[in-house]
Amino acid sequence: MDAVNAFNQELFSLMDMKPPISRAKMILITKAAIKAIKLYKHVVQIVEKFIKKCKPEYKVPGLYVIDSIVRQSRHQFGTDKDVFGPRFSKNITATFQYLYLCPSEDKSKIVRVLNLWQKNGVFKIEIIQPLLDMAAGTSNAAPGAENVTNNEGSPPPPVKVSSELPQAPTNSMPAVPQLPSSDAFAAVAQLFQTTQGQQLQQILQTFQQPPKPQSPALDSAVMAQVQAITAQLKTAPTQPPEQKTAFDKKLLDRFDYDDEPEAVEDSKKEDAVAVATTALATAAPPVPAAATPAVAPAVPASSATSPPPPQAPFGYPGDGMQQPAYTQHQNVDQFQPRMMALQQDSMQHQVPLPPNGQMPGFGLLSAPPPFPPMPQPGMPQPGMPQPGMPQPGLSQPGLPQPGMPQPGMPQPGMPQPGMPQPGLPQPGLPQPGMPQPGMPQPGMPQPGMPQPGMPPTPPVQPTFQPTFQPQNEPHSQKPHQQEMEVEQPCVTEVKRHVPESRKSRSRSPKRRRSRSGSRSRRSRHRRSRSRSRDRRRHSPRSRSQERRDREKERERRQKGLPQIKSETASVCSTTLWVGQLDKRTTQQDVASLLEEFGPIESINMIPPRGCAYIVMVHRQDAYRALQKLSRGNYKVNQKSIKIAWALNKGIKADFKQYWDVELGVTYIPWDKVKAEELESFCEGGMLDSDTLNPDWKGIPKKPENEVAQNGGAEASHTEPVSPIPKPVPVPVPALPVPAPITVPPPQVPPHQPGPPVVGALQPPAFTPPLGIPPPGFGPGVPPPPPPPPPFLRPGFNPMHLPPGFLPPGPPPPITPPVSIPPPHTPPISIPNLVSGARGNAESADSAKMYGSAGPPAAPTSLPTPPVTQPVSLLGTQGVAPGPVIGLQAPSTGLLGARPGLIPLQRPPGMPPPHLQRFPMMPPRPMPPHMMHRGPPPGPGGFAMPPPHGMKGPFPPHGPFVRPGGMPGLGGPGPGPGGSEDRDGRQQQPQQQQQQQQQQQQQQQQQQQQPPPQQSQTQQQPAPSQQPAPAQQQPQQFRNDNRQQFNSGRDQERFGRRSFGSRVENDRERYGSRSDERDNSNRERREWGRRSPERDRHRDLEERSRRSSGHRDRDRDSRDRESRREKEESRGKEKHEVADRAGGNKAVEAPLSQVGNTDTVSELNKGEAMATVVKPEESPAEATSSVEPEKDSGSAAEAPR
């Protein structure tokens, strides 16, 4: 009984909905009924009770429930095992008596359902016929038709015909072969196989027999018979045309349970009429000439072939259409040849019937002629009978007679479809004294039927028809024809609203193609019918207004917005309830189910209840998710789920009474809510702006936007966040001296008003590739330095030198750097930024270091963009122009001689693209440091890698080489200190020997004087990066790139070489590790092998690797801490370093000699000038010193 109770609740919940009932609701009711099939008697009784008790507007939905249940049951269990159909049929008469209490405009829908049942054999004709008669009795048109038949005295034959129709179900159509081979003819043949069809054939033959001059009396008699038949057909004939049983498809699709149910019915009627006319036209030629007057009654059968007639009782003009054709017997002879030609044309799918201008494809046969779209102006369009326009004897309109001259192509003796045959002499079709009773007068366009201008529209339909014709099912084809006709009525409308009608048509064809003909037909008809219905109801309204309304409504439906209620605010929920979840289901499972539909704002899991509440960002996404997931059997963790709208959080308890769970909307009357409360309603939902009180309009917009973009807030948050990181890179431009600063704004343009302030977070504006001047810069202006590296702290001000440094040099130096920078300057600036990015802590540390180290360190570490600044620092030393970049004290200060940071010492100038460090720079590959592909940290581990990172010869590094990032660094990568470095560098045997010797000496010294070395290292962190380059091409770097290295750099490097610990023990330990590993076999041999070129490449790679490694390390807070500690220790050791500088320098000189004899001499000089820090010498020294340092360490340790 639970299933029964569930069905009962589901069914009676219809009362809570406004009529047109949605297809989704029908499906739910049908499923509930099928689940309760074991108690099917209860289900049937519940439905009957509902129909009996419900309001008139719910009668037709009740009928749709019966239809849906029976069809689904027949489809699912088979016609033999279906229990619902027989059970409903037991009390169906009483049920239909209640059904006919529906509004008059809904009766056509009931007839349509009956016709479908007859066509598909859902119920026997014996059951359906009385129901159709009942409908006829209730409709005005039916009585008129009956009168006509009575006049003829052939009413009984029609009745017989109707009874016969059931006997010869339209489903059985063996006679098809008799007709010419074509889909159209096949359909017609099937129709004719029925008894009614045979009668129609006879009638056609009868028409053929009489010559054109047939007496009007005969015509009138025939017409009377035809009318009688049509009246009967109105009751049941429509059924045959729709023989197609398509239970396979969503059975509910046939009916629109949607907003426009009426339209569907109308369309079906029209379709039936069209089919009948086409069938008649096609059949006429094939029909043997054995027509009997008595056959005339059979005409109803023919009309039956065109299901629309049954609807005629409702004033469906189409029914009478056939009659007019018959009335024009005189023309029949001429008419038939034309019909034949038309049929052939249609068979050939010659879409344009020249006469009609209609596409033959519609009718499948010569149906095109039947299409009234071509009716003469003022003549009702056949097949376009307006529902609600009962035309009691009018048979002409709905059924264009086959062979009937298309409008503009009146065929003599051929009734114009939609042209009243009865007292309307048709041009070329004079029917003397044969006015059709109830036939619309030619001058009487049928209401709702576009008269003139119809012809143009037909072509549109034809295009669709062909798509249908391919379908072999005669019924589907007929329906298509009917559809075409139906739409034709809208042709005038189409003209006016060409876009819409075309849209609907073009859309419907697609639907037809993809779905069963019946459904597509319905949808198309629904549209066209609804249009005609609208015309009837709102004739005064402009069609353009209707079209706009329809389009707006369609857009709203697509957005998932519910119907608008007057003076009611709609708060549309974007919250979905998903139930029957397995308790093991996780948020990720639910998110994966719904994220395909759109962004999810939040997911609230309630495992004990096995459900979740999902708030989607957009209503449309939630609507699509609900539509899709509610139809299929979707599973999460192998368990089927349920999904429904959930009341959004913003709705307070007071307003829950207004919640509509079916539509997922809370309709709150304007007078119940205050404008200021609206915003609070948006949580988990959105306001429908179209439903807001104009007085509030301003207020809601805000909430609405927020709601509509429930993710909006998130997005904004996200943006700010991302900008911050991005800005970090941007700041670099600020590094340049003030002049550059002015220029930089363009780089940072989007977010950084003043590039100078590196610290300010810069939105995600990225500077163009460094090589290209930013948009704002003139060609002559040096490009601003590259944006700060991502790690640069937003607040970092490149212009601000560390405490120990002089203020930035005068701008002039900048210009020289500009010339120098071509490739390198930006990278250098980046290093500064790097330090900044690391954070203020780093900058502070670096500042400490700088204070202790003094300017020399700065020049060493950051030569590039800050060059302008460094110039001032180094300006004294004359390094200003070229070296200025190299000398950037500020950058050094930022990075500091930080143990952890590799003083990024890059040759001045823009870094090569591969070295440039802005991940966002489009042109550049990810900067090496950014990539985590570097070898594991070198001997130093993550500890403070030796600062010497860069070997002089290679192109500058990514803006910042991380400690250990530079191959040359003693840091973790292969570098001068690393094993790979050794391999990379080819030194001449002499150099190797010297280096080894020096290394040994240095190691000893280091052990003795670790602090001084460390301090020196601090002072000259940058040079350490460039050791290799110096060896390779010491002079080159001396000239411009590495001029900043101090003579004491070698020792400093060695001091640093301890790899993160300045203690000699550590150094020995790390050094031995690296030396043993790298140097054990390779020391001399590898050094000897190395050539500057090889070193250069190796260094680049190593640098990139290390920089990546170092970068990561630096970022690591632990690394920073260790660096800080080391820095502090260095600060202490700096004094010692100064004391021991002499000894170290002595050592360094030999080392430099090892690297290069030239370097050695310069190193000696450098040593003397260590305090001064000459850029030229320092680079050479640094490079040479670094390598010797490593070599010596390794040599000394290896023996150990």
From Swiss-Prot:
N6-acetyllysine modifications at: 49
Top-rank taxon: Eukaryota
GO BP: any one term: negative regulation of termination of RNA polymerase II transcription, poly(A)-coupled
Keywords associated with the record: Acetylation, Nucleus, Phosphoprotein, RNA-binding, Transcription, Transcription regulation
SUPFAM superfamilies referenced in this protein's UniProt entry, alphabetically: ENTH/VHS domain (SSF48464), RNA-binding domain, RBD (SSF54928)
Its job: Anti-terminator protein required to prevent early mRNA termination during transcription. Together with SCAF8, acts by suppressing the use of early, alternative poly(A) sites, thereby preventing the accumulation of non-functional truncated proteins. Mechanistically, associates with the phosphorylated C-terminal heptapeptide repeat domain (CTD) of the largest RNA polymerase II subunit (POLR2A), and subsequently binds nascent RNA upstream of early polyadenylation sites to prevent premature mRNA transcript cleavage and polyadenylation.
Protein name as annotated: SR-related and CTD-associated factor 4
Native species: Rattus norvegicus
Native organism taxonomy: Eukaryota, Metazoa, Chordata, Craniata, Vertebrata
